[in-house]
Amino acid sequence: NMDHYMELDYFKANSTIALYSLYSDEPTYYVPFAAVDASVAKEHDSYFFLRRFSVFEPWVLSDDERENTLTPEEIATVDESIAEIRARSMYAVPEIEVDSTDRILALVTCSYELPDARFTLFCRALREGETPESVAAIVQNATAMN
């Protein structure tokens, strides 16, 4: 239940997400780096333009394509988006680094905390050398932002 990620203790205790695919026998593991609860209605103060990420091409490229084809402008756009996501997050997890070369997963569900709201859990794929256990130890340092 994604709503549980709105609680810091649950966020810390469930620090990796396994994504199973038809294309691999092994799951891809992701670590959450931000949790955003915001309205998707422009007239609300907490408005967050979530739909821009649904067609954000650099995040749907393969790892090799992303590393070899992003222009400096695209890299800057990705980095700005990551910075905005982190600034809007309910939690701070600064030790989990995220940049334009990472594969990002956004899990979205309806939220009833705000009008027309969506709760979004932003995660990045584990990097080479990381394990679910190693990032779990880092996520334990997460703190509430507000």
Where does each model-flagged region fall?
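Extracytoplasmic/periplasmic soluble domains downstream of a signal peptide or transmembrane helix
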Residues: 1-146
